[in-house]
C-alpha cells in the first residue's frame, strides 16, 4: 500500500522546514513554497517557478495540497457571504465573509458542531462531531481567498481580519488551532497582524493558559451573564470553570499579550428579559471592574426553535448607558447577514440537521457491526 501523502496545508513554518530538512533541502525552500501557497494560492507544484524541477518532483511524490471545497454560498443584501465548506464524510462547516468600508473579516470554524451546548446558540444545539484539522481551518481562508480572487482585483475586498468565532470552541481544539493561527500570522503565510486575528472562547481556562504560552492574538471572551447562576444555564461550561476562574484566566492572558493592548473584548448576547435589565448591567459592570475590557453587546439573532427573543433597542440602550456610566467602552454590534442565517449564533442551519442524520447513520452502522461480530 502506498504511503499517505503529506498535506502541506497542515504544516506551519516550523513543520514545513522540518519536512524540507528531511528531504535534504534548505529552510528557505520551505519559505518559498509557503509564499506560493498563501500569497498566490498556487496548488500545482509545476507552477512554482522558483523551485527547481527535482524538488518539485520530490514534493509531488511525497506531498499534496488539499483544502476543503466550497459546497455552496449565499450572499446577503448587506454584502455578507456565508459559505458551506465540505470537510468530508457528509460533514460541512460554515464560514462567513463580512466586508466593511475599511476591512473584510472572515469568521472561521474550528470544529464540526460544538460540545458546549450554549442554550442561545444554534451551533450549540447541533451537538459535537469532531475537531477540524489544520488544513481544514486554514483551508477555509484559502478557499474563500480563491473565491475572492486572491491577488486579483475582483471587486471584493480581500480578507484583512480573521475571527475564530465560527462553529466550535477553539480552545477545545488547540492542537490544530495554534498551528493554524501560526500560519495566519506568518509573513510567509497569510501575513495577518496579531491584532487582526481574534480567538473567541467561552472559558476553557486551562487551555486559555496554554494559548497564552504559545501565541499572542486578540482575545474575545463570551461572558453573556453577570453571575454564575444565570451563566450556568446560558453557558453550561461555567459549571466547570465559573466566572471567577474565567476572569482570572483572562487577566493572566492580558498580562502576557501585546495583541490586546491591555484589554480584551467581552461578548454579551442581549436576550429579552433574560440578561438585559439595568440591574444586571450594574451587576456586569461590578463583575468586570478588575478585568480591563471593552464590552460588545450583541443583539440576539433568533433561529428556528430558539427559546429566546432579541432584546428591544430601548432595553439595549438602557443597558449600554449603565455600563458607560462605569467608564466602559461599549459597542452594540451591528447585525450582519441575518437574512441568510449568517449572524452571530445562527451558524449551523441545515448543516445541523445533516450532522444529526450522519450521527444517526453511524449509530446504526455501529449497531449492525456489533450484531455481526
From Swiss-Prot:
Cellular-component GO terms for this entry: cytoplasm
Record InterPro entries: Aldolase_TIM, Methyltransferase_A, RlmN_N, RNA_MTrfase_RlmN, rRNA_lsu_MTrfase_RlmN/Cfr, rSAM
Pfam families for this protein: Radical_SAM (PF04055), RlmN_N (PF21016)
GO terms (BP aspect): rRNA base methylation; tRNA methylation
Active site: 94, 344
Reaction(s) the record says it catalyses: adenosine(2503) in 23S rRNA + 2 reduced [2Fe-2S]-[ferredoxin] + 2 S-adenosyl-L-methionine = 2-methyladenosine(2503) in 23S rRNA + 5'-deoxyadenosine + L-methionine + 2 oxidized [2Fe-2S]-[ferredoxin] + S-adenosyl-L-homocysteine; adenosine(37) in tRNA + 2 reduced [2Fe-2S]-[ferredoxin] + 2 S-adenosyl-L-methionine = 2-methyladenosine(37) in tRNA + 5'-deoxyadenosine + L-methionine + 2 oxidized [2Fe-2S]-[ferredoxin] + S-adenosyl-L-homocysteine
Keywords: 4Fe-4S, Cytoplasm, Disulfide bond, Iron, Iron-sulfur, Metal-binding, Methyltransferase, rRNA processing, S-adenosyl-L-methionine, Transferase, tRNA processing
Keyword rRNA processing: yes
Subcellular locations according to the entry: Cytoplasm
Domain named Radical SAM core: residues: 100-339
Disulphide bonds in the chain: 107-344
Top EC group: transferase
Alphabetized GO MF terms: 4 iron, 4 sulfur cluster binding; metal ion binding; rRNA (adenine(2503)-C2-)-methyltransferase activity; rRNA binding; tRNA (adenine(37)-C2)-methyltransferase activity; tRNA binding
Record-stated family: Belongs to the radical SAM superfamily. RlmN family.
Function (record text): Specifically methylates position 2 of adenine 2503 in 23S rRNA and position 2 of adenine 37 in tRNAs. m2A2503 modification seems to play a crucial role in the proofreading step occurring at the peptidyl transferase center and thus would serve to optimize ribosomal fidelity.
Additional comment: Reaction proceeds by a ping-pong mechanism involving intermediate methylation of a conserved cysteine residue.
Designated name of the protein: Dual-specificity RNA methyltransferase RlmN
